[in-house]
């Protein structure tokens, strides 16, 4: 069974997630951190090593959306915030754990993308740019470190039933070939596969779970 370190800036939410896991007999801790700050990311890594002795899997799941603004309408502050959370945070976390993976001779990094890794439209200028950047970063990590036993892939969900996608109307869902939003459990199952030995020959892959959204809109 996995031992999990949950991190983020929302202490209440983080503790809720950990309690939900521990109530089910799983082992987990929460470490409060701003994932855009190098020192705080390093503190999370240190805490994980102190608690569990090693790190095997890094899941870079932090992310925010924009207001579907084009480049002219987009405020610079929002652009900077998106780039910090969606792009800089995965870089900082990966930079912190990869030396440990190299020493172990193995490790897994799963970055979170979206349909916006492949197409325009699922967000505005900042969001689409950020997710294209995450895709490029994932590919380069896989290229640079795959020979050292480090597997890096990107999981790209579509509309999933989460607070981030609340308020999606039926008209938009009906344009998805599957005609529904995805479930968190479906994303979790895919993440487990990408973390497992069953996907060991996958390096730098962009794996979609989006109900067919990137195939085209009906």
Residue ranges and their predicted role:
Residues 68, 119, 192, 203-218:
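Short C-terminal tail/terminal secondary-structure segment
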Residues 69-71, 75-81, 172:
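Substrate-binding pocket helix/loop in short-chain dehydrogenase/reductase
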Residues 94, 130, 138:
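Active-site helix of classical SDR
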Residues 114:
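Residue(s) in the substrate-gating loop at a strand-loop-helix junction
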Residues 176-187:
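A conserved structural motif in NAD(P)-dependent oxidoreductases
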């Amino acid at each position: 069974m996995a031992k999990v370190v949950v991190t983020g800036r929302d202490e209440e939410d983080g503790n809720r997630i950990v309690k939900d896991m521990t109530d089910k007999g799983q082992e987990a801790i929460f470490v409060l951190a701003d994932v855009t700050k190098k020192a705080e990311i390093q503190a999370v890594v240190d805490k994980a090593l102190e608690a569990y002795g090693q790190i095997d899997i890094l899941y870079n799941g932090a992310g925010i959306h924009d207001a579907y603004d084009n480049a002219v309408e987009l405020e610079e502050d929002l652009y900077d915030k998106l780039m910090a959370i969606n792009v800089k945070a995965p870089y900082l976390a990966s930079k912190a754990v990869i030396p440990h993976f190299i020493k172990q001779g193995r490790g897994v990094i799963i970055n979170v993308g979206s349909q916006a890794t492949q197409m325009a439209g699922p967000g505005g200028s900042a969001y689409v740019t950020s997710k294209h950047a995450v895709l490029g970063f994932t590919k380069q990590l896989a290229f640079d470190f795959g020979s050292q036993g480090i597997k890096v892939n990107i999981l790209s969900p579509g509309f999933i039933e989460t607070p981030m996608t609340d308020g999606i109307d039926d008209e938009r869902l009906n344009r998805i070939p599957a005609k529904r939003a995805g479930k968190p459990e479906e994303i979790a199952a895919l993440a487990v596969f990408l973390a497992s030995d069953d996907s060991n020959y996958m390096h730098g892959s962009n794996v979609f779970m989006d109900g067919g959204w990137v195939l085209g809109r009906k």
